[in-house]
């Protein structure tokens, strides 16, 4: 059931927290999916067109869930989304009363369904058949086996799937939770995605309005914006949801979402509401277990981050064929088509989001600034503040004024090495399908760290002091200014040259300890007003993502215009790893700094 009336209330009271997105917006994202909810939707959606019964094999076993799960998973991957399916464990004891009520409703629906079949009322048959559906343990096990054979990760929650999904987002192992149960927000999921399985199959009799010409539309709810829009902290939000009505306890009769919100705003907690409420007007249940319900939301039974294993395995093609064709009598041609789509879809997930490709231009390190200051003292420029044509040109002029110091010879060699590196990248781009640039890129489904290919190689460029690209600043004050805005550092909060990063109070440090695949997202950090960030401050903002293979955008012919649009939105200069040839500077904006 989730939280009664929560989505509608949020839409009215905190409209900025809800927005419509297209499935394409989730490209490159890892999404934790409530598997039981998905299977339920597939069984309802994929039915016999005449009697609205489940699809079955020759033995009479239901196959709707298998067909829907396979088709939908491939479709998600074809759009670049990386799904993790989370299955329910044992239901919590507090939910016993709610489960009994659901059982009674299902029994009543079965009686009405039987009557509708006797009367031949197809509309009533369709209505009641959906209410009698339940996902069995056997169907869950079949779904797990199918996903494993497809190479898609499965997580078995010790209790509720939506709470485990929420904690996957808290652990930064997933971007969002996909479920229709709004209580995922109460468990603390950062982002909730609804309608992910809308129009689950082309065989469904009802085309969802969201699958219109304008695209496959999803609903995204952002928890941070919910709290901001309602002006509640998380504890107040949890108590508000309990008062609205949840699965874990009864609620106070006569209190709906609007009244609950007003009471929470006035008294801040359920305890104080009970103390001050008009007992004649509102009847409090004799067994109002709100304290236990609150604890279930705050401290749910979930796997810890260390206990979770996300296994992006290779598809087991032959076993998958046998499972579908021999065990469940799927058409061989149809299965072959699914497998071909699956293999192609895995390649789509290697394409990174455009905002992953661009990273804000790295600010100069203290070490580099000091070196430049020393140069300025030794060599006075002809015109103070004169704009240099390019870093290489300026460094060449400086070296000529220093009477060919030994350092200049070393720098020339470094520049040559950099040129070779780019040539090597170009050769990789010209290679066959599936080849990647030499930057430590891995199979997107491989999450293990490559010790032989440190994450720092992702950028594959040397600091200005190492490469000879020493750039003069117009004034001494500018050269020694504390960097503000977005500062991107290498491991341990250091910059490209190995010096510590010094931040202003308005700075945000992105400490990239591991830039291989999704771990880059997991280990990115926002550290505001601190020059000594600690691991664990994992607050990921929109667009603060990285790619382990910047050449993907080049290999896939990134649209120049679209790239410039994204850059204009950020209104900053960028550092482009491997400097793609088909992306140029944005006019009337700060120029793109080449590698």
From Swiss-Prot:
Top-level EC class: hydrolase
SUPFAM superfamilies on file: 5' to 3' exonuclease, C-terminal subdomain (SSF47807), PIN domain-like (SSF88723)
Annotated region (Interaction with PCNA), positions in chain: 350-358
Protein name from the UniProt record: Flap endonuclease 1
Subcellular location as annotated: Nucleus, Nucleolus; Nucleus, Nucleoplasm; Mitochondrion
Family according to the record: Belongs to the XPG/RAD2 endonuclease family. FEN1 subfamily.
EC id: 3.1.-.-
Main location: nucleus
Gene Ontology CC annotation, any one: nucleoplasm
Cofactor note: Binds 2 magnesium ions per subunit. They probably participate in the reaction catalyzed by the enzyme. May bind an additional third magnesium ion after substrate binding.
Required cofactor names: Mg(2+)
Stored Pfam families: XPG_I (PF00867), XPG_N (PF00752)
One GO term (biological process): DNA replication, removal of RNA primer
Record GO terms (molecular function): 5'-3' exonuclease activity; 5'-flap endonuclease activity; DNA binding; magnesium ion binding
Compositional bias of kind Acidic residues: 426-436
Amino acid composition bias (Polar residues), ranges on this chain: 392-401
